Amino acid sequence: NIGDRSFAGCENLTSVIIPNSVANIGYSVFDGCTSLAEITIPSSVTSIGGNAFVNTPWLAARQEENPLVIVNGILLDGTTCTDEEIVIPNDVTSICGFAFWENHMTSVVIPDSVTSIGSYAFSDCGNLKNITIPDSVTFFGESVFTNTAWVTYRYDENPLVIINHILVDVDRDQCSGKVTIPDGVTSIAGGAFAYCNQMTEISIPDSVNSIGSFAFNGCMTLKEIAIPEGVTSIDEATFYGCYSLTSISIPKSVTFIGEVVFCNCMNLSDVYYAGTPEQWNAIAITGGNSTDNYDNYFLVTAAIHFADGT
């Protein structure tokens, strides 16, 4: 694994050889490496984060060869593609974050070989009206379709935009008061409800087993929430800035709580945990249970209520 932004801004770096022990390259790893012209990427690499090679001569050269830059079945970049109608090749298995950010295309056809679409992949493609999304896609990153004509049209059909049982986006203007996610939804994508500032309550069905990062970030009027059993992690900044949040119910299936999940949740007073104190203490909470760490300070200082009434 090469972690996020590991070499970002290394302006004198000219060449990189990645060994075949590497499977994952994080986001913005080589961002701003303005002299990086040669990169050897082995076939072992199966995941590449958004903007991994942005602002490098290597990417610029690849874009000149083909505006759809594909490595190991991963579509890294299509921002320079000038076609109004884009058909992604059948050998692509995933689309990187920011891959088409701010592209002027009007339509895109995604083949059924694709299983995942990264964060902001089509964000700010204002002219994008038609998208063909196959059933094979089982993962959407954060804010994949933000500020596209396509998602605006979907709002007219339903303020909750659901694709392949994944809730990917919502119309902030229509989601007010209590919002109910329909049964059958299995995942809430990252950023799906971010800054939904008229929503005070939300009902999440038991069918949901994953909630993406930043999912409820900045929902300033959200007062309480119950996470269903089956969700195993609460990822980065999920409830960041939920100023009105006073209580949350957490199932015993949760084993991990990420960075700044409850940052600025200053009114969080009660946490209802479905397990035992021992199970609670076994949860990997970023920053630990220390009140000296601001990441999840408001979580660890709230009253924890356990299933046995203690």
In which residue ranges do the predicted regions lie?
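A structural signal for leucine-rich repeat
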Residues: C263, A284-G287
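Short low-complexity, flexible loop/linker segments enriched in glycine and/or proline
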Residues: V54, T146, T286-G287
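Extracellular/surface-exposed low-complexity segments
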Residues: G287-T310
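Structural signature of tandem-repeat unit edges
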Residues: N1, C10-N24, C33-S47, T56-N72, ...
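Consensus positions within tandem repeat domains that build extended binding/scaffold surfaces
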Residues: G3-S6, G26-D31, G49-A52, G97-A99, ...
